[in-house]
Regions:
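Extracytoplasmic c-type cytochrome modules immediately beyond a signal peptide or single-pass transmembrane anchor
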Residues: 12-101, 113-123
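Sec/Tat signal peptide C-region and signal peptidase I cleavage site
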Residues: 3-15
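Detector for the c-type heme attachment site
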Residues: 105-113
């Protein structure tokens, strides 16, 4: 019975992502894809920082500690990656990439509910 109550609560707590949020996530997905391939690393890391400013504001307005912390972690990782790429420091680039991935994962684990292979809601 308790499990059903939690499931129902979670289902009603999820909401469609606003169009701006969907755009930011698609932009971040493209940026991450390019970073994984090593394409224009400094540029994509800088673009990611700009996108993350909007994401951070989104979570700040929602008073989400997890959303805010993970957004800040991702932004810091993107800044570190841009700096490392500029200097050609591959070890620092790997470390920064892990920071970005950890920030994304932390937020997705807390706030993303998978509805289908292509549809997610915010919880």
């Amino acid at each position: 019975m308790a499990i059903a109550a939690v499931a129902i609560s979670a289902a009603f707590g999820a909401e469609d992502a606003p169009p701006d949020h969907v755009k930011w996530m698609k932009d971040l997905g493209s940026q991450m894809g390019a970073l994984r391939k090593g394409v224009d690393v400094e540029k994509n890391a800088n673009d990611m920082q700009a996108t993350m400013k909007d994401v951070t504001e989104f979570w700040k307005k929602r008073n989400s500690e997890v959303g805010l912390k993970t957004s800040n972690d991702t932004t810091a990782g993107a800044a570190a990656l841009a700096k490392a790429a500029q200097g050609g420091d591959k070890e620092a680039m790997m470390s920064a990439s892990k920071m970005i991935g950890g920030g994304c994962k932390g937020c997705h684990d807390a706030h993303r509910e998978k509805i289908s292979d292509t549809v997610y809601k915010i919880k």
